[in-house]
Structure formats: C-alpha cells, structure tokens
Amino acid sequence: MQVEVDLPNHSYHIKIEEGCFSEAGDWVSHLWQKQMITIITDSNVEILYGESLVNQLKKQGFTVHVFSFAAGEASKTLEVANRIYGFLAKHHMTRSDGIIALGGGVVGDLAAFVASTYMRGIHFLQIPTSLTAQVDSSIGGKTGVNTSFAKNMVGTFAQPDGVLIDPVTLKTLGNRELVEGMGEVIKYGLIDDIKLWHILEEMDGTIDSILDSALAIIYHSCQVKRKHVLADQYDKGLRMHLNFGHTIGHAIEVHAGYGEIMHGEAVAIGMIQLSRVAERKNLMPRGISQDIYNMCLKFGLPVHYAEWDKDVLFDILSHDKKASGQFIKIVILPQLGSATVHQIPLEEMRDYLEK
C-alpha cells in the first residue's frame, strides 16, 4: 500500500507494507543520493533495529552515524536537541546530507525538529516503529519539543522526504505501548472515517486483534491524516479537527509529568471528558461520549485521570497553541465520523474540566 502526499511545495509517499523494514536501505537509496546519513533513535529501538538499518544503508554506499538518546517523553527537549546539533556538527553533517528518524513519536518529533532547524533545514525521512507514530506523528510535517509549560510548545512545520511503515515492528512493542496508539486511531474514526469506526466496532479489543488489523487501521488513519494535511498544511482550519481530545489530553500529559501518561492515553481521556461536557452544553448529540468511553474501554485505554485538578489543568491549557487572546478553539463532533471547530472564551474551558 502507498499513500501519496502531494503538497504544493513538497510531495512524498508513505509506504505501508508488512516486512518492508528489511528493504529500508533500498528504499532510502531510491529517494536519496546523499553521502552521509545520521540515524536518530532511542535506546530501546536502537537495540531492536539500529544495527539492521545501519548495515542496510552501508550496503547502499552511505556513510552512517547513529545518535541514540534515553527512551521516553522526558527526552523530547531542547537540551537533547542541542546535543544532537553538536553530534551532527562533530561529524560534519551538511545540508547535502540527511537524517533518518527511527522510532516512535518522541524520536520522530525530535529528529524532525532537529532536521528542520540544523543549518536552517536538512532533509529527513521517517521510519516509525510505534502505532502512534505510524498513524499520526510521522505524517504531516509537525515537529516539536516539550517545555515545562506545554507539550510541543517549540516546533516547526517540516515535511519528510518519505515515510516507511512496517506493521511488523508493532510486534516488538509492549502491550501498553501498542494500546496507547489506539487513542489516535479511535480519534480518526470519530472525526472523519465512519468506515474505520465500524472496523473498530468489529474488533474484539485484544492485542491480537490490533496486530491482525494493523495494516487496515494504519492505512485508514494515514488517509485521514493525508486529507487534513493537504487541505490545511499549517493547521489553520480543517487540520484542527485532528486536535480532537488534545487540548485536555496535552494538559494531562504535562500535569502528570511527561511519560507518566502516554500520549494516546491522554487523548482518550481528553476525548471522553470534552464530549461529556459538550453534550451537557447541547453542542454534541447525547450518547457520543458513551460510545467513545466504551470504545476506549474495549481496547484497554484509560478512561479517567486519577490526579484530576481542574485549576492546575486550566492553567496548563491556557498555554495551548489553540488559544488566541481570551479565546480558544475546541473540536466537537456533530455526529460520529464528523468534526467541527468551535471557538469559546478561554475562561469557559473551566467548564470542560468539571467532572
């Protein structure tokens, strides 16, 4: 399977195929004729896939370096980015060379941020190995690092030269790491793909069901992401639908401490919480929040956050990128499979944090 992303100023393809990681070197050689490549990865993924990718690239004649950092959301910082800049400079990486992001969402966001800012931008590729990265963060060109104030507070828009997705890599994930990716998959079904929602309804929620259906749910998710990115590359309109559940979700991630609550888990809680309040305000049809709750519960996603503190969460989300002056934009669902953006006074977000 292949998904084409044809943007006005940059086009690339997303290759989705079981077992395609074993052909990554050949894939890269058809996209790049560069002399030097730095693979950016984390300590977990390096052990699983680092040596294989290095060997594949060397067989194609590339000079290869590897930068690995401690796995986890806590590493997605300007401090780690600065270490990578130093590594690239030490190895005399230039704008004619390239970066490959090998790993999950943290790796992809951080590596893409570095690539887009080092020497004002060098080329990069994404090889995502987690479900969250395969269905969401590796696609669309958003890069970013976290700060103590907010998630992804510092970032850029930069498109990769290609994305290689091998669903087989999901088999090396722990159960929690696999399940958290379903938060984003469920979101796609809710905002724009009723067929995907029906696929999820037919699944029994087990780990095996996720792995067995991986190719289909990744493809559907990539198609939804592609549609929104093509229509709104810089997140000014339609693409904002992809933020459903994220305003509250990101606040939960910051409040819990980066890495304590995984991204897809926080999104699941955020979707449920926002929908319940939106229903009470008659902004959404009754029953959708229960549908979301049931779907998240079926796949083993958390449906509540034990350390809920509405005042602290409000303070955090007031720094959200979707806030503008005294207003903030939220995403609501007129029906299953459809989304719209609704602007409210920032202060009204306190209502959406009421349990």
Swiss-Prot record:
It is found in: Cytoplasm. Pfam families: DHQ_synthase, DHQS_C. GO terms for molecular function: 3-dehydroquinate synthase activity; metal ion binding; nucleotide binding. Its main location: cytoplasm. NAD(+) binds at residues 105-109, 129-130, 142, 151, 169-172. The keyword Hydrolase does not apply. Signal peptide: none annotated. Pathway: Metabolic intermediate biosynthesis; chorismate biosynthesis; chorismate from D-erythrose 4-phosphate and phosphoenolpyruvate: step 2/7. GO terms for cellular component: cytoplasm. Binds 1 divalent metal cation per subunit. Can use either Co(2+) or Zn(2+). It catalyses: 7-phospho-2-dehydro-3-deoxy-D-arabino-heptonate = 3-dehydroquinate + phosphate. Zn(2+) binds at residues 184, 246, 263. Its cofactor is NAD(+); Co(2+); Zn(2+). Its EC number is 4.2.3.4. It is an enzyme of class 4 (lyase). PANTHER family: 3-DEHYDROQUINATE SYNTHASE, 3-DEHYDROQUINATE SYNTHASE, CHLOROPLASTIC. Belongs to the sugar phosphate cyclases superfamily. Dehydroquinate synthase family. NCBIfam families: aroB. This is 3-dehydroquinate synthase. It comes from Streptococcus agalactiae serotype III (strain NEM316).
